[in-house]
């Protein structure tokens, strides 16, 4: 079958695993093609330079070929030095990568999400206090990209504008409805307005945003637990 040679694309390694004795299967997130899997021939060989280049969080320039679902990597160059993710930021980066592996359709371009991903990694690498806001912002952008439409500014029951001092309960496929019930699905109006504006400036809003994104992402992730979350839990236990 005739091969198709792609142009250079910017991208990142999301995940990689051994394939045969000398090669790697590499899952990529690229600016134009989105998520795809490539075969990096000889990348595990002792003298291969690819082993050090094909690492998560390193901005790359990539080319590949092939018409089948599994492409063959033909060229790769580092576009910049690796983003310095360490400790909590590193595990957060693994979490973001796993999200993309789990929820994105293969070979579907998400150019705006690619920019959101780059901004998220930059935030994770910048300072510890930016980790949670960067994660929450990316999760909301990811949900929007997936077509998850929810109105944070209006009560789904009455259509009235959300009151920042009232509480609203989330109902899947409907939205937020004014309610006196307080449970895991209940949010203050001021939190909903902050979600809409992507403003995560205080700990209460960050916690509420994290609670909401876990609820919203569940329909895409299913019941299979995230490995990155389990690894982070183990890391935190070790730190104690």
UniProtKB/Swiss-Prot annotation:
Cellular-component GO terms for this entry: bacterial nucleoid
Keyword DNA repair assigned to the entry: answer is yes
Which cystines does this chain contain?
A: none
* One BP annotation, GO: double-strand break repair
Which key words tag this protein in UniProt? DNA damage, DNA recombination, DNA repair
The cross-references to InterPro entries, in alphabetical order and at most eight, read: ARFGAP/RecO (IPR037278), DNA_rep/recomb_RecO_N (IPR022572), NA-bd_OB-fold (IPR012340), RecO (IPR003717), RecO_C (IPR042242)
Q: Which stretch is the leader sequence?
A: none
User: What Pfam families does the record tag this protein with?
Assistant: RecO_C, RecO_N
Q: Could you tell me which SUPFAM superfamilies the record lists for this protein?
A: ArfGap/RecO-like zinc finger, Nucleic acid-binding proteins
HAMAP family noted in UniProt: RecO
Which family is this protein grouped under?
Belongs to the RecO family.
The protein's job, in short, is: Involved in DNA repair and RecF pathway recombination.
What PANTHER family does the annotation carry? DNA REPAIR PROTEIN RECO
The protein's name is DNA repair protein RecO
What does the record give as the organism's lineage? Bacteria, Pseudomonadati, Pseudomonadota, Gammaproteobacteria, Pasteurellales
Q: Which gene encodes it?
A: recO
